[in-house]
Structures are given as structure tokens and as C-alpha cells.
Curated annotation (Swiss-Prot):
<keyword id="KW-0699">rRNA-binding</keyword>
<keyword id="KW-0694">RNA-binding</keyword>
<dbReference type="InterPro" id="IPR019980">
    <property type="entry name" value="Ribosomal_uS13_bac-type"/>
</dbReference>
<dbReference type="Pfam" id="PF00416">
    <property type="entry name" value="Ribosomal_S13"/>
</dbReference>
<comment type="function">
    <text>Located at the top of the head of the 30S subunit, it contacts several helices of the 16S rRNA. In the 70S ribosome it contacts the 23S rRNA (bridge B1a) and protein L5 of the 50S subunit (bridge B1b), connecting the 2 subunits; these bridges are implicated in subunit movement. Contacts the tRNAs in the A and P-sites.</text>
</comment>
<dbReference type="GO" id="GO:0003735">
    <property type="term" value="F:structural constituent of ribosome"/>
</dbReference>
<dbReference type="GO" id="GO:0006412">
    <property type="term" value="P:translation"/>
</dbReference>
<dbReference type="InterPro" id="IPR001892">
    <property type="entry name" value="Ribosomal_uS13"/>
</dbReference>
<dbReference type="GO" id="GO:0015935">
    <property type="term" value="C:small ribosomal subunit"/>
</dbReference>
<dbReference type="GO" id="GO:0019843">
    <property type="term" value="F:rRNA binding"/>
</dbReference>
<keyword id="KW-0687">Ribonucleoprotein</keyword>
<dbReference type="GO" id="GO:0000049">
    <property type="term" value="F:tRNA binding"/>
</dbReference>
<dbReference type="InterPro" id="IPR010979">
    <property type="entry name" value="Ribosomal_uS13-like_H2TH"/>
</dbReference>
<keyword id="KW-0689">Ribosomal protein</keyword>
<comment type="subunit">
    <text>Part of the 30S ribosomal subunit. Forms a loose heterodimer with protein S19. Forms two bridges to the 50S subunit in the 70S ribosome.</text>
</comment>
<feature type="region of interest" description="Disordered">
    <location>
        <begin position="91"/>
        <end position="118"/>
    </location>
</feature>
<protein>
    <recommendedName>
        <fullName>Small ribosomal subunit protein uS13</fullName>
    </recommendedName>
</protein>
Length: 118
């Protein structure tokens, strides 16, 4: 297993697919990383040399990934909630944020139906 940014990359997949197992690295970012390091995207991870892996590790550290990205997303949501803006209130109440109707749908966001107490 190749280890990049604290994540085990599957060795039997192409490098572009393997890089996507890192939180915060998608298709476009993975292709950009491969282009910057001059590695063919269809190369399997097990075929990479140690120098290529080191180059990949140094290139990946330029992006905000894994724990830092998760922390930023959480802090952004917390900031909205503390601010008391519309989106923050919707987050606090566990309702949809982007204008979807909630009379009939939004069960995923609202959770299971609650029985009416008499």
C-alpha cells in the first residue's frame, strides 16, 4: 500500500482513481496533480517508483485536504450558526438550506416522522 497524506492508496488502481480516496481530492484535482508531477494518469500505483511517490506526496501537500478541510467545513457551518443568518438557522434546525419545500418532502434532512403527542 502506498501511503500519501496519511491515507492508504489502493495499489491495484490507476493513480488518478487512487488519489481520489483522499478526502478533498476529486477527479480534476487528481488529474492536475498527475500533470504537475509528469506521471501518466493510467499508471497503476504499484508501478510507481519511490521518487514518484515522494513527488506525489509533496504535490498533494499543496492542497487543503483531509483533517484541515474537514475542520474548515465544520468551522464554516459553525460560523453560520453563530451568526444567526438564514442558512445558520436552517442548519441549527436540521432543515434544507437552499429553498426546497418542506411541507411534503425533506424527510432525509428532517429525519423519521415524529408521532403526534396528545
Amino acid at each position: 500500500m502506498a501511503r500519501i497524506a496519511g491515507v492508504n492508496i489502493p495499489v491495484n488502481k490507476h493513480i488518478v482513481i487512487g488519489l481520489r480516496s483522499i478526502y478533498g481530492v476529486g477527479q480534476t484535482t487528481a488529474q492536475k496533480i498527475c500533470a504537475d508531477v509528469n506521471i501518466d494518469p493510467t499508471t497503476k500505483v504499484r508501478e510507481l517508483t519511490e521518487e514518484q511517490l515522494e513527488a506525489l506526496r509533496s504535490e498533494v501537500t499543496k492542497f487543503k485536504i483531509e483533517g484541515d478541510l474537514r475542520r474548515d467545513v465544520t468551522m464554516n457551518i459553525k460560523r453560520l450558526m453563530d451568526m444567526g443568518c438564514y442558512r445558520g438557522i436552517r442548519h441549527r434546525r436540521s432543515l434544507p438550506l437552499r429553498g426546497q419545500r418542506t411541507k411534503n418532502n425533506a424527510r432525509t434532512r428532517k429525519g423519521p416522522k415524529k408521532p403526534i403527542k396528545r
